[in-house]
Structures are given as C-alpha cells and as structure tokens.
C-alpha cells in the first residue's frame, strides 16, 4: 500500500477512504495477497510487542517491555512515549529531587556522561543536563482515531468515547475470560471477537451514553470475523503502510492490561505447541471500535479531525526520532542514578575476600533461593554459626515440575515462567511417621475422599451465598457464624503461617502427606539429581546435613499474595520443590545410582527441607520425622542458630516497616505475625523492592558483605565449570528471571498509571484470578501497586537497571553473550549492566569490550 497523499480540504481526504462497512456475505473482491500479507505482518508485529501478564494465583514479575528488548532502551522509551504516553525512564522530577538531595552527585553525572558516547556526540554537558530537569513533560503522544474524534465541540455533553470504549472492552473481556467468579458463564464458541460483537449488538444503552443514537444500526453490519474487521478498520484509516505496525501497537496500548493477559494465553499456548487467537481478537475489537464511531459521525468536524490524524501519522517516523533524541538526557540521568549505587556496591565488595577462606569442618549446608530477601538471612546465619555454609540457587531447585495436591484436579507449575514443566509431583500418604515410612494406598484413598468431601461442602456453602434466591436467607441463617471472622479482622491473630496446600485435609493425615516426584525409572531420578547437585556445587564435599530452604510469604486479604512468593516457582512457595528434592536425594536407590554419575553421597549425609517465611523471617522444617537421630540432633542445634539469625534480620527490617528494632525478640516477632495476619495491612513486607544487583560468583566474593537485601546471589565456581555449561544456564535462566523482576519494579515506579496496578485499597479481583480493576472498571491493571513501592512518605524502591556481576573468565562470558541473541540484546541495548570480577578490579562490559571501572569505583 502506498502512502496516501493528503488533499487540501478535509472533505476530499475523507472521500478517498472507503467508509461503508462491507455487508456480510458480500461478493466484493478481497484485497490482493500482498496487501493482506502486509496487514498480517503489521498485526503480528504489534502483538509481539506486548509482554505477558500472569494470573494472580501464579503471579510472577515480568518486564512489560519484554517484547521490545531487541531495541535500545532509549528507543523503546521514545516509542512508549509517542505511541502510548508511557514513561520508561525515571521522571525528571524524581531525578531532580535525587540531585538536590545529593543522592546523585556531580561525580555520578560525570561518570554517566563518560559512559554514553551519544551524550558526548550531542554536546551534552553537566550544566545542560541539570537545566533539562526543569522541563518535566514527555514527548507528545501521537493521537489515535478515537482521540481526534473524541475532541469534538460536543465532548462535554457526553461520556468520553475513549473512556467508554475502554470500559466496554474491559467489561467484555472480564465476562469472557472469567471461569472462576460468575456462576452463569458466557457462550464462548465464537471466540472473543464474536462474543464482543454479540454483546455490543444487544447493548441498547451504550449508544445513548456515548451520544451516538445511530450506533445500533451501524453495528448490524460489523464484519463477522476479526480478520475482516482488521482489514476494514485499517482500510478505513488510510494510513501509510510503513506506520501500520506502530499504529496498531498504539491501539493495543490503550488496553494494555487485557492485551498482556491475552499475551499470557499466547505464551502458554506456544509452550504447548499451539496458537492462541485472543490477542489478535482484542486488536480487531479495539480497531473496529474506532471505525464504528467514525461511521456514526459524518460532519465537518469529524472530517477535519480525520485529516489531522492522517497528517500526524505521516510524520510518525520523525516524531519517534525527535523523541529518542529528546530522551537522551533522561538516559544520562538514569545512568547517573545507577552510578551512585554501583560505586557503593563496588566499595563494599572490595572488602570481601578475593580468595576462598581456609576450609573448615562444615556441619550444615543450606541452599537458599537467590531472592534478595535471602541475602540478609544467609549473612546472619553464617555470622551466628560459622559451621554453616550457605548456597544461593534458583528457588525451584532445578526441578522442572508441576504439582498436583492430593485429592484435587489442580495442576500448577512450580518452575520459572520462562520454562514448561516436564515432570510431575503429587502427594503421597505414608503408613506412619518415621524414617521408614512406606506408602499406604488405603490411607491415601481415604484422605482423598475426606478432602474432596470437605472441599465440596465448602464450595456448596460458597455457592449458596451467591445465588440471588438464597442470598438474604443465607445471611439470616449463617450470618452469626461470621462474628468469629469479624473478630479476627478487628484483632488479627499472631498465629504462624498456615499451609494452603493442606486446606481440607484431615489433621491425622497432614504429618504423613508428602510430595513425591514421579519418574519413569531410578536412572531418570538419578540423572536429575546429578544435574541439580552439580549446578549447586554439591557434587562433592557434602556436609552431614544438607538443607534446601525454599521461601514463601504470609499475608491476609491480599490479591497479589503470590507476587510475594517465589518467582522461580511461578508465584508459589518453594515448599514442594524443597521437599521433593530432599525426599528424592534420601532414597537409597537414587543415592546408589548417583555413583554412575560420578557423585558419591556419604552414608551420614541427610537431606532436609525448610521454608523461609519472608514476612516474619521464621524458618519452618518439613518431614523432620524422616531424619535419623544424628541428623535430627543437628537440626535441633540449628534451631537456636536460626532463632538468633532470624532475630538479627527482623531488626534490620524493622525500621522500614515502622517498627522499633530495639523491641524484645518475642515482641518484634509478634508484631510481624500480627501484620501478616492483618487483612487491612497493605504493606506486610516489601517483597523485592530495592533490588539492584545479581552476583554470580563463589560465596567468598560476598561473604560478610552487607548488601542491604538488594542483591540476588547465585553461587558459581568457574573452576568446576570446565565447559561453561553451568554459566550458560545461569545467564539464560536466572539472569533473565532477575531481569524480569528488576524491570517490573522499575516500570511500576516510573509509570504507575500505565504499568502499575494502582491503589490496593481500590482493587477488585477480576475473573477469580485473572487480575484486578482499580475501582469497578477501566483497563485490567498490571504491575505492582503503589503500596508495594511507597511507604506513604517516601519511595522504598529505586528504579535502577540490574547490575550483573559474574566471576568467570572473559571468554566464557562472551561465549554465552555471542551464542544467545536474547542475552546479547539485554547487554547491548542497555537493559542491564554486565560486570565481571577481574584479577585486580571490577570490569564493565561495554561496546563489546571489557573496561576497568573508573577510579571513582573501588577495586576488588
């Protein structure tokens, strides 16, 4: 399609664009193949730009710009500003505050200018950068069709068309995708587009609300398929073909929340080897809405607005280029903010040992998740008892599994969202407690029946309270039973964390209900165990007690509770993975089979599982009845160590939660438990707020260093990784996961309106677990709430890009960067910083070369 030349008057421009909706079943000739291919390519390109958003019950952090990381950060910032009015870099107002407060120093600004060749080429100086902070506005956004149509003389007498369309599309999606909340489910046979079309044709009030009395008649002729709707709407616009994809991406950004949900459905489908049409359907719906409104308006103001739209989009390439140039100063300030943190980080790491300490007798090895909340506890534990060696590893512990709780049909992934499960874990009931407990099929069947009965009864009660015919009578009969709930709300308990996976299971079975990994053979189990132990660095020198410590949170009345659990376990706690792995490695046949893989597990080595409650910093052990006497004695001794270490961490965290760090141990724990069980508490913990670095190195590089709970820590010993395969795994899995986490926090803070979920107090859950509305409408909200980032007086998080530090040879790191395009994109396009531990100092990777840090940074 060639560029449409604009005529002098609007009427002529409007006449050039076909405006009649093709009737269904018409014999008109279709578009030529080339035009259709171009349209399909533009739609596909726009859809690829949308990152997925996981449901609430599997909430994991995602970089909302994931579909754009093949471009430099500043170019993405320009596109998001011009196409969606979205802020990518920290606001200039916040940077000005950091400058005035001294958080960003002149040295930081000079360092940022030195790092950015484009800034030097553009003649930017420190004075010019400071002057730019006085101008706070984003580059102007290009309008969409509905924007120019909405800006008519009668706009104050009716509902805003853009808001009305967003609301209608959002409510339609909420009804269509809901499978948990409504008792009466919609008809989905015709897909999302067909459902929307049918819903709109039966909504006789929306035309009056929008001031479009002719809307109903126009709707009768809507194209029957989403493909026809896309072609019709694009043809209606008459825009030049080179800007189609940009315009379509801008259209999707108006319903970015639902687009992200549809992208998640597409992500899941791709993992299963199939396609999902929902994102294309949503694009067709949003495109068609603009064309419908245009059809209903045919006056001078509409024609002038349409001509203005075409004129502005003719200039889209230059608008994007101008925005990219204007945002250069924002990139400088982003680097300056990061330079201050990086200087402090380098200085602290310089105090750690460059060489491993002299080996001593290790009583306990404890593998923790790499999560930033594990760092303070690991440091405290090593300080309290030097005979403990802590290890950092991804919290799913290398198990590519999905878990099915006993007596349920639920199946949930327990691994990073980047991966698909290839193995299964389910619960088993043992005949009795103790080291020699064997499976008891009869007890398992009885437990399943009892659980199904209890869960079924609970579902019936819930259902009775929702039906219109029973709602009032239910309150009369059962209302008094809610007095206990009301009391617990008014006076939150100080109970320890409850285990949701045991809901409905009779108490007599709980102690003997254990998750077990299913595998075809002992050899399959042994091969998996060998890979995990080698990746953890535990293929040799095993301690008598090896502990796998997953983590989970404890909150009440929190729609985003899963976001505080383990991201590596797909928004679940790490309990299932830790227990499954420990039980697997304690199986005698598996230990014997490990010999063939070159791993000898000493007879006195026992594996155990535990969970770190990140809200209260308590440690809970599992399957302790399976421990032999010697291992149980070590565990019992470890309890006093854990108590002291946990108390130290709680005192570190107390000021950020408004608590007194000098309070007695028991009082502080009680206060944290009460916060965790308080349904009105919007900030039970800070999650991963403050995250800024990822260290892939032996523990001695960070041991004893106070990293303030801001660093992900993954153990890695390059001397044992002869072929670089472990490093490759770490840079293509955990590094991507930490990048996703880092950018979700970054985006939610830089633009909380578009990329955050707003105010927790106004959240309403959509579809049971899909997401939330802020209030009762608008787009689906994605990202983090304001309360996850701000304490009411100040921001807890700083929007810094992740600094990744690796202790490995230059060539090994470069080999991974060169082999994997996604890693190359993240590094070269400025989505993260890549550093390494050099022989004498820290080195930064830039423009394909390793360069020592400036003299302003400390050496290691």
From Swiss-Prot:
What is the membrane topology listed in the Swiss-Prot or TrEMBL record? Peripheral membrane protein
Q: What is its main location?
A: membrane
Compartments (UniProt record): Cell inner membrane
Cofactor dependence: Zn(2+)
**GO molecular function terms here?**
zinc ion binding
Keywords in alphabetical order, please. Cell inner membrane, Cell membrane, Membrane, Metal-binding, Transport, Zinc
GO-annotated cellular components: plasma membrane
Chain positions recorded as Zn(2+) binding sites: 369, 371, 551, 566
**What is the top-level taxon of the source organism?**
Bacteria
* A Pfam family matched in the record: DabA
> Positions of the region Disordered?
1-32
What is the recorded function of this protein according to its Swiss-Prot or TrEMBL entry? Part of an energy-coupled inorganic carbon pump.
Query: Belongs to which family?
Result: Belongs to the inorganic carbon transporter (TC 9.A.2) DabA family.
| Subunit composition and interactions | Forms a complex with DabB.
Q: What is this protein called?
A: Probable inorganic carbon transporter subunit DabA
Q: Report the source organism.
A: Ralstonia pickettii (strain 12J)
Q: Which gene encodes it?
A: dabA
